Amino acid sequence: MQGFAVKLTTPTSVDIAITKKCNHRCIHCYNVWRNDDANQDVLKVLTDEQIDIITNELVKNNVWRATLTGGEPLSELSVLYKLIQAFGSKGISLGMNTNLSLMTDDIARTLTEEYHWDNILLTSLPGLTAEICDKVTQISGSYERIVRGIDICKKYGIPVGINIVISKENMYQLENLYEFLEKHTVSYVSITRAIAPLYDRDNPAFFLSENEIIHIADILETVHRRFGVSVGSVTPFPLCILKNISKYQDIVSASCAAGISRCSIDAVTGDISACTHEERVYGNIYSTGLKNAWDNMYEWREGLLVNDECKECRYLSFCGGECRMIAGTESHVKYNLNRNADIQYTPYSPIEPVDKQTKFRVSHHVRYRREPFGGVLRCEDNECYVSESIILIYEHIMKREIVSVSDFLEICEESEYLYNAIIELEKMKILRRIH
């Protein structure tokens, strides 16, 4: 599909399942092997050689960020600490997905004091009451242990995000989220639609209606406005369902990155997929390498897996379409993906104009790399694909503390394009205006 997505030569981010062990048995879990007690992979522990191979592959392919997941990463502490040390020494930024039920004071102290961990931990919170949480995890006492883990992280200054995976089993209790947030401090709230796992494809509990999806968006919008925390969803919201983009502008900024800028690595077996929910394997990091697998998943970047309802939609390049895994599993979809939907959008407040007297402070928390189309710039959580000329402009000012338009005129003629490029760098928070 022409123009569907940028064609990165390698991913900028990866999810790495560092173990197959998990102390929960969530009914929505995408890991098909976790119900197979005979699967010997559950018992395997990563070797130092495997850790070295993964680290070298990420460095060689210029991967910026790795999210450590599982299984439950806190169930393999020695491996977890080795990976944090190895990746950190190579400048790879880290995130972690954990249910936090195994978090202790000792672990939190080790993370912060020995490994200087200050990145967000995204924890799965399957229910907002003990009854529902324990029902979803199928483990008695899981809710109390998760909440205890959240509070321990707060005690040691570790930022926590919560991800609530929603099906019809726990949809009705979302209103309890407000009370939960009044008692427990978090930095991020995600509400994610459950995807029917491979072993339970036809379970109607996983198929949400259009009104239920809109209700999720309304809850997130209220959380952002009331508590001032960042909000989002692991699976994207189709714009033709939300319709009012202006109302939900804080949750529609991210479309699916699987196979476009991100992929998933099973560190135990080495298998590489585009998405953690996907059954297909595109390569193996130990035998054929990351680059080979990335090249093999071209169909994700070409838009070949986009569902038919989204392919001809004029908003596809902005929306990204429905989650590929949901679109591929919901044979009884309860909502209508409508390419002719009336999308309502009021642009963000305009940025102040730039003139020759305008000065900016330059962020030094920027990663960038060149690509055939230009390059990728990342500042904080903003990752943008830009032209070669913007890369050149950034390289000219990247080591400076403060710049003005006159600094840009050293390499560019004054033009509308230059001023627009400066504004783009400001939107990415690479430049911050000095008033």
Which role fits each region the language model picked out?
Residues 1-8, 272, 276-374, 421-432:
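Flexible mid-to-C-terminal extensions adjoining Fe-S/redox cofactors in radical SAM and related proteins
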Residues 364-392:
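Short alpha-helical segments that sit at the start of domains
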